[in-house]
From Swiss-Prot:
GO terms for cellular component: extracellular region. Residues 1-24 form the signal peptide. This is Uncharacterized shell protein 5. It comes from Margaritifera margaritifera (Freshwater pearl mussel). Keywords: Secreted, Signal.
Length: 57
């Protein structure tokens, strides 16, 4: 049972890292992702940036 959970955990972590790498944002780079242009260009968290653009004009 321990081996099964160990393998499942390893597979899940591997898949998460793989997905992150496909998108260019592995888990250890999530802080960079939070500040990335793509992340900040969508959703409520982008409103501050929208305000900055508005007042820059």
């Amino acid at each position: 049972m321990y081996d099964t959970w160990f393998v499942l955990t390893a597979v899940v972590l591997f898949v998460l890292v793989l997905i992150g790498n496909v998108h260019g944002y592995p888990p250890w780079a999530w802080s960079g992702f939070m500040g990335s242009k793509w992340y900040n260009s969508w959703g409520p968290w982008a409103w501050r940036g929208w305000d900055d653009d508005w007042f820059d004009d």
